[in-house]
């Protein structure tokens, strides 16, 4: 199984277009050891030819252009992307569907019932796309049972609900429902190795812990370093957990949890532009490295 990180940043990417936080300012001044990052998305394949896209970010066109395996190879109009799994209905994970409207066949979209509702009402992308290529929506199970995707041989997918947040536009932003956010286990049926993908994690529930323990690679929420990061950066008073993200540092933080999982490859993704781990010379980045935790970047490839 091949995992390609198309985008490793949180909403807005890095640098964010209107941000002058320490990281963004220093990046523009070329005074920081950091890589730019587009908004989070990955692609997964068993054979390197037929790929499943996880989330469709607003940066999808440039992400796919930088990813030769997705380019047309069998005719005038073609793509290596055969299906799309949506983790949630956040704007930075779904807007890219509009950029895929030139598809010559309906987009095969796998998502929860709650995401389907959001993308049919509050942010009606599915209805808009009916006037272009169309969408064939497939509802994923939330009980952890496995499913396969037609045309994607050698991979099995399992999904479960996570405690995080529905997007701000959703009518149930402050009234959580199962399926607002999901985690995904992708299993390589040839060798049994597993990826656990959860770019938005607000709480480690027992079923999440079990999935993390069973995985050979964890690609998980790296949004914030500290609970009050947005306040510390002078941006707003929202706390990390209020926005549905476990910070890396502090009691019960992501780093503490990852330190109890010594056998898996551990990679943080969905990294906010304010997070000091973007600076590869920072003490926070060094702390992660010493703990065996990687920071995802655009173009990273993982083989399981």
Curated annotation (Swiss-Prot):
Keywords: PQQ biosynthesis, Transport. GO terms for biological process: pyrroloquinoline quinone biosynthetic process. Pfam families: Lactamase_B_2 (PF12706). Pathway: Cofactor biosynthesis; pyrroloquinoline quinone biosynthesis. May be involved in the transport of PQQ or its precursor to the periplasm, in association with PQQ biosynthesis, but is not absolutely required for this synthesis. Belongs to the PqqB family. This is Coenzyme PQQ synthesis protein B. The gene is pqqB.
